[in-house]
Amino acid sequence: MDNKSNGKLIALAIGGAVLMGTLFFLVSFLTGYSPAPNHSAILTPLRSFMGWFLLIFCASLIIMGLGKMSGAISDKWFLSFPLSIFVIVMVMFFSLRFYWEKGRTTTVDGKYIRSVEQLNDFLNKPAATSDLPPVPADFDFAAAEKLTDAKCNKCHTLGSVADLFRTKYKKTGQVKLIVKRMQGFPGANISDDEVIEIGTWLQEKF
């Protein structure tokens, strides 16, 4: 395969990637696409376009490379073939690694989360607001824990809903709201004072 044919294949890969990316870019507006409030209406779909471009272009290069290798197998194929695959995979890995340096999860204050450690740190930070009163200095956490275990583990254990509780209610300062919902279930037998006691323990210790 000569250099002219190689140029045509590369041009075809780039042209196909641009065409597909443009198609998805336009369809995103036709389907009523609404970008995130902290991104512009053009920048967000443009990032999606770049993702599709890299995906299709790298896939085209892989197909071209495998085709060339299949036509040039020699007595050294056992060495060239795995090395070529390794190089292709590493190029894709580092291109995606360095291009998407900001991560995929964005907090409301514009920061990015890239790792599990960063996610855990974010979830463990106290909420900015709370629907519970301040914790009294003489609050009995041991008694509140026993009360919570007795009242809040009837239908299911707290551990089974821990992630949902921490992300949807505790992180948004709505612990009292979820305890009030539990109070409304038949047979809950949770008084208004116990709502505060249970909510305080969940907010501070769970």
UniProtKB/Swiss-Prot annotation:
Source domain of life: Bacteria
Annotated heme binding sites: C152, C155, H156, M182
GO MF entries: electron transfer activity; heme binding; metal ion binding
Post-translational modification: Binds 1 heme group per subunit.
Pfam families in alphabetical order: Cytochrome-c551
Membrane topology of this protein: Multi-pass membrane protein
Name used for this protein in its record: Photosynthetic reaction center cytochrome c-551
Gene this protein is translated from: pscC
